[in-house]
Amino acid sequence: MSRVCELTGKRAMVGNNVSHAMNKTKRKFNANLVKKRFFLPEEDRWVTLKVCTSALKDINKKGISAVIKEAKAKGFLQK
């Protein structure tokens, strides 16, 4: 499975490693992803999602139901 947040769509970015001599080599900045189980009370079931830690902050703030509804509206979540 790819390194993409299922709720926000965040994925790896590309940048440079820069040495002291200012030599640049390509590198990847991966999203900070966590595989996490959430309980959906309205569906009375558990779902496992691969989410970034910024999405976890949104879930703590808004609740899992609201965040999943937003992700489906934006087209990130097909479940």
Swiss-Prot record:
* Family to which the UniProt record says this protein belongs: Belongs to the bacterial ribosomal protein bL28 family.
GO molecular function terms attached to this record: structural constituent of ribosome
Name the chain's protein. Answer: Large ribosomal subunit protein bL28
Pfam families cross-referenced by the UniProt entry: Ribosomal_L28
Q: Which GO terms describe its biological process?
A: translation
Q: Which InterPro entries match?
A: Bacterial_rp_bL28 (IPR050096), Ribosomal_bL28 (IPR026569), Ribosomal_bL28/bL31-like_sf (IPR034704), Ribosomal_bL28_bact-type (IPR001383), Ribosomal_bL28_sf (IPR037147)
Q: Name one GO cellular component term.
A: ribosome
Concerning Gene3D superfamilies, the annotation shows: Ribosomal protein L28/L24 (2.30.170.40)
The source organism is Christiangramia forsetii (strain DSM 17595 / CGMCC 1.15422 / KT0803)
- Highest taxon of source: Bacteria
Q: What are the record keywords, sorted?
A: Ribonucleoprotein, Ribosomal protein
